[in-house]
Amino acid sequence: MALQDILSVSDLNRYIKLVLEKEPHLQDIWVRGEISNFTHHSSGHMYFTLKDKQSRIKVVMFASYNRFLRFLPKDGAKAIVRGSISAYERDGAYQFYAKEMQPDGLGSLYLAFEQLKEKLAQEGLFAAERKRMLPRFPKRVGVVTSPTGAAIRDICTTIRRRYPQAEIVLSPAVVQGADAPASIVSAIRIMNDQPDIDVLIVGRGGGSIEELWAFNDENVARAIATSLIPVISAVGHETDVTIADFVADVRAATPTAAAELAVPHYLEWVERVRQLEIRMHRAVRGTMTEQRNRLTRLGNSYAMRQPERRLEEAAERLDRAHLRMRQSMKHLLDRRRERYTRLDEQIKRYRLADQIGEKRKNLSKLRATLDERMLGRLNQKRMAFAARIATLEALSPLKVMQRGFSLVYTNDRLVKSVEQFAPGDEIMVRLSDGSATARVEKVNREEEKQSGSQKNGTRD
């Protein structure tokens, strides 16, 4: 045995892996079995064992594939898995690498149904507050279903019989099989792009659970939930319940029932219009009777018996209102006029600023001239005043008394004549340096010409 024929463990495992991956019968195959030892790792990858009564195989399903699963795998569930066989080099063990997985059998379908139902319910897609009201008088009714099935015939017949003026717009879709979910989603989106679609019917006729399974698809449910048009689900018969029924705004037991919910019956509305007409006539008659009675009461009232007086009162109120309006206008105009006057004065002051400056200069010159002239005039007056003071001082009685003369008073009055007193009267003689009191003993008049008497009086 040559040394070059000896393989390492790694080389051997790598070769086994290469052989397995090149074998066409081990690639892209379906395997049925029961799930056990299921683990959903934090990385998102799934690890489990697929077994039957005689054997088992380890299975790996990476997160990039298992995120598309329509159900949550668990131990004991039967499943059909699509994938390929390969080897894990480190352990030298072959295992099945899954790319797709579906529940196997009706029990698994029911499990997938319940799991999706719970998931969407937790997201609030079934909440009553999300449900929208259907339009009462739709003009265009959209339908998503098979163009060749009985459902479209039942819907068209019912709508044309009940409400012939409504237009039916069909968006054809595959309603069963592997291609059905994508086809239904596409048809719903196409219908949402159409103008003026008032209500949308999504459904099909009856069938087995497998045939109806497209309406339990998560993508279909989300397309219905996000539709801008109110949706009526109509899948199968009354006993058939799908995820689409929970998500739709209204659930109909059959396609025929969906058509009846979508449009009103014209005879029902004819009867309703007739009833409304009767009610309207009654209301009009009642209103007319009430207004007629009111008119009669008004005609019999005091005010209507003397309309001239009412007109006079109204005219008086009008005159008063007119007077108040004129007064208000006058007051307003006065205020505006006063304001404009103030503004005009302010403007004038601003315009006269330069003139005021010029006048101020002229005034300064005039003040200087006036001061000069007044000073000259004041000097003249001062000199004249001094001359008059000198004259007055020369003529002053005090000056005369300083030369030896005196003033005689009787009863506080200056004596100018001997006729003012008689012998025995008390007199006061005022001299330049004081005064003296004397008594008259004798009065000599000038005409008596007595010698030795003094000219203006006799001394005591």
Swiss-Prot record:
Q: Which GO terms describe its biological process?
A: DNA catabolic process
- Native organism is Brevibacillus brevis (strain 47 / JCM 6285 / NBRC 100599)
Subunit relationships: Heterooligomer composed of large and small subunits.
Q: Which UniProt keywords apply?
A: Cytoplasm, Exonuclease, Hydrolase, Nuclease
Q: Which Pfam families match?
A: Exonuc_VII_L, tRNA_anti_2
- Please provide one cellular component term from the Gene Ontology annotations of this protein: cytoplasm
Q: What's this protein's family per the entry?
A: Belongs to the XseA family.
* Name the record gives this protein: Exodeoxyribonuclease 7 large subunit
Q: Which reaction does it catalyse?
A: Exonucleolytic cleavage in either 5'- to 3'- or 3'- to 5'-direction to yield nucleoside 5'-phosphates
Q: Known EC number(s)? A: 3.1.11.6
